[in-house]
Amino acid sequence: MKILICNDDGYQAPGLVALYDALKDVAEVEVVAPEQNNSAKSNALTLHTPMYVCRASNGFRYINGTPADCVHIALTGLLGYRPDLVLAGINNGANMGDDTIYSGTVGAAMEGYLFGIPAIAFSQVEKNWSHLASAARKARDLVLQMSQQDLIGSSPWLLNVNIPNLTFDEIAHVKLCRLGRRHAAEAVITQVSPRGDTMYWIGAAGPAKDEAEGTDFHATSLGHIAMTPLKVDLTDHDSLGYWAQTAAKLTLA
């Protein structure tokens, strides 16, 4: 089994190292990750700035680009082979609900999916790296069990997986979930620069809004691993009929 691993926290992030260490003895693993933290870069590609591939002392390769750049370059010119699985993470903090729209971790996994490869985005729920080894072991077990079920190397699929920051034995079983929703993000943070200009920092993510039973928020709050299948199609299929009536009345020719 050949696995490509990326992340959005950067090639030196503990979560990336832990995921690699957990899988290196059971698969042929290659790491291609961003040089710097690229959180919230979603699916962004770098189109107007040259990028360079460098080799770290531990063998990881890193690129001065986004997570999606890293996977794109790896799959279209760097590796020289097609991996069986693309993994992203382990992210430092949750990617649940609306987070998935912004997440560079999900964006990296989605880039693999767009190239027809099964992909998983792994995240820990809290941002303190606590019990990271447990999360990495759970990620390893999930990958191995999926391999045993012949799901890897098959037709493409995309999964978002959030793992609670608990000990290995405290983490409950996997629950298949839908995405929840967050409230709108908190207000921007303003500061005055040494030159007197106003600086703006994006505020923290909003708290959970839809955390009902069946959501990723609910599952992880009970100690479960939340697993959500994702898709790329953003079409609102339920409202196509409504908008068809409106579109029929528009005269823009």
Curated annotation (Swiss-Prot):
UniProt GO cellular component terms: cytoplasm
Signal sequence annotation: none
Keyword Hydrolase included in the entry's annotation: yes
Molecular functions per Gene Ontology: 3'-nucleotidase activity; 5'-nucleotidase activity; exopolyphosphatase activity; metal ion binding; nucleotide binding
Enzyme class: hydrolase
Obligatory cofactor(s): a divalent metal cation
Highest taxon above the source species: Bacteria
Compartmental location: Cytoplasm
Binding site for a divalent metal cation: 8-9, 39, 91
UniProt xrefs under Gene3D superfamilies: Survival protein SurE-like phosphatase/nucleotidase
Keywords: Cytoplasm, Hydrolase, Metal-binding, Nucleotide-binding
Keyword Hydrolase: yes
Catalyzed chemical reaction(s): a ribonucleoside 5'-phosphate + H2O = a ribonucleoside + phosphate
Cofactor note: Binds 1 divalent metal cation per subunit.
Enzyme nomenclature, EC number: 3.1.3.5
Protein function: Nucleotidase that shows phosphatase activity on nucleoside 5'-monophosphates.
PANTHER family: 5'-NUCLEOTIDASE SURE, 5'_3'-NUCLEOTIDASE SURE
Family label: Belongs to the SurE nucleotidase family.
Name listed for the protein in its UniProt record: 5'-nucleotidase SurE
Species this protein is from: Albidiferax ferrireducens (strain ATCC BAA-621 / DSM 15236 / T118)
Gene name tied to this protein: surE
